[in-house]
Amino acid sequence: MKILSGDAGKVTETERRFLSEEELAQGIRLSCMVYPEEELEVETLQKEKKAEVLSEGYVPEFEKHTEIKKQLIHIRKTNLKDQTSMEDQLLIQLGNVEIPFSLLQHLELAEGTYTAVIWSEKSLMALEPGDQTDYLYGAAIDIGTTTVVTSLIDMMTGKEMGTASRINAQKEFGLDVLTRISYETEHPEDGKEHLQKVITDSINEMLDEVCRKTEVPGKGRIEKHDIYEITVAANCTMMHMLLGVSARSIGRAPYAPAFVKSKNLRAAEIGIQAGEGARLYCLPSVSAYIGADIVAGAYVCELRKQQKNVLFIDIGTNGEIVFSDHGRLLSCSCAAGPALEGMNISSGMRAAAGAIEDVKITEQGVKLQIIGQEEYRQEEPEGVCGSGILAVVKELRRTGLIRKDGAFIKPKDISEEDYRYPMLELDGRKRKFKMTERLRITQGDVRQVQLAKGAILSGFYALLKKAGRTMEDLDQVMIAGQFGAHLPAESLIGTGILPKEVKDKLIYVGNSSKTGAYLALMSGKAKQEMEELAHHMEYMELGATEGYERLFADCLMFPDESEITE
């Protein structure tokens, strides 16, 4: 692949053996050797490919018009003949804008030049000494159930200045939204406040981190007080918890959230530390289980403008699906669980150095690809991440080590000479797959993947049926989500998470939730259009759909061995 932008890390010795100095100078790298610390924009060099991959930074065309503006003003010295107040001097130059009382309380301006920071052409947010009109920064944040990602954006140019990410600190209260809602319910005195504080603390820490490592020529290091707008995309539960609004109603029938409309408030109101008067814009949701992250993704992928049949799937803990039937949007949410993100797995871990990310079962043994290592090895890893658990389950089914119903075969059912025999292990009556000397894949691990598979595939079929469409009518399947981008088509098809008919129709769109937050930061029009999109998206409650339980049970079955490729 060719690196178009971003830091792909140090060139390895293996790459130097296979690539010429001219190719390396052009930014050409071996994709299997690259372990970036930040998002990359890449160009694939294969002439033939079965799945198109759009870069993590894919952004559709949009009208840049930020709601935060800067204007240079001059405060003149007053005297006995000219006693014009500072407030009036500001209004004369800025026009009919609101000047908050909190700003007047601390207004001590000497004669000189200042930079006024104005929100939505109607309210003065801050006054900066000198000419700061070349500098304006914001942050776009994606709050997922499992991870939180923050990007620092130069709002003058639209350039991403840096990123920070971490595991959602709310994991101590539960790995999924329902467990966290249960925590709030069980702790009525302070549960809601605890859930809010851990996420706002994380955001403040990430803003500190990304500012600390970002310097601008002529200005120096960016500080948190330079950030004047923060936009957030998140699922509906995470948005409630961020804003300190009770999410209890989301956890019980009829699953009615406290709010779904966008929210625009001062960041300081919920404890987020940024510039004076900094705004916090939270994107709109559709329902309790189709949140702002999905609205953002649908907007980024321009689903309302499609002139064909497109299925959009955000693969994460919640597993949301949107079907665009020539612009008509139908949606549903399926409880995929955190298995595909490496959680709820006996040896699971996040995608980090030391994690197994790919697995091959061969007659010579189990071959592992481990993040941070250069090629397939049999060295001892730390655990298995989401793409790794999906790969191993695919291989277990391909080699017949698990049946179509997901159960491990019995060691007594195969010959001791069979290359697979030493890979199976009995722990009492429990059967396990021996992946390494230390790590095992249990029946429970397989079941976690199976439940995710059943949830996503059944939602896929249910939406098609609701729209009156067949598999043949489907033109494109877009895979979104920070984790979805790392799940190869071979594993998605091989485990039956997606039907084999769509293998050549897949497009990976990366973290479209964060991209949507970015668009909202850079364009007031994008905010308005997302709000319109959310209003027009239809939601289907799978649990209330006739025949869904039977459909879900059918979708739990794995594909036939003959249908799975290596």
Indicate residue ranges for each PLM-predicted region.
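Glycine-rich phosphate-binding/hydrolytic loop that grips phosphoryl groups
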Residues: S285-V300, Q450-G454, K505-E541
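Catalytic P-loop NTP-binding/switch module of NTPases
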Residues: E56-F62, M161-G162, R350, K367-G386, ...
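Nucleotide/phosphate-binding catalytic cleft detector across ATP-hydrolyzing
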Residues: R16-A140, T145, T157, G191, ...
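A contiguous, well-structured pocket-lining segment that forms one wall/lid of small-molecule binding clefts
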Residues: R397-A467
